[in-house]
């Protein structure tokens, strides 16, 4: 049986863009969401392997935005 491999892209968190639009500090956002500034930094830099839907909802509430405002899908380069 032949194996099929599908190249996947990546999900980018545009938290820094929303922070600038809202004139908010990373530490303030972390406090509103209820996570440590270190964990918020992991999300912001794209080093997180997963994010809970509840955390995404809290981010949207704190930033007054929709998930699509902070998430972006980039296709894998071929």
Give a label for each model feature.
Residues 16, 27, 57:
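Residues within the helices of the helix-turn-helix
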Residues 19, 30, 60:
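The alpha-helix within a helix-turn-helix
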Residues 24-42:
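Short alpha-helical DNA-recognition segment
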Residues 64-78:
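Short C-terminal boundary/hinge segments that cap the last helix of small helical domains
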Residues 39-42, 55, 69:
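Residue-level recognition of specific faces of alpha-helices
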Residues 47-58:
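Short, basic-rich loop-to-helix N-cap that marks the start of a DNA-contacting helix
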Residues 20, 34, 45, 75:
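Residue-level detection of the helix-turn-helix DNA-binding "recognition helix"
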Residues 1-24:
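A short, Lys/Arg-rich alpha-helix, primarily the initiator
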């Amino acid at each position: 049986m032949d194996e099929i491999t599908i190249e996947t892209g990546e999900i980018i968190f545009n938290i820094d863009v929303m922070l600038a639009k809202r004139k908010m500090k990373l530490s303030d956002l972390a406090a509103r969401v209820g996570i440590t500034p270190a964990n918020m930094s992991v999300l912001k830099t794209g080093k997180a392997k997963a994010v809970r839907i509840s955390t995404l909802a809290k981010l949207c509430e704190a930033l007054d935005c929709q998930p699509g405002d902070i998430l972006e899908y980039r296709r894998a380069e071929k």
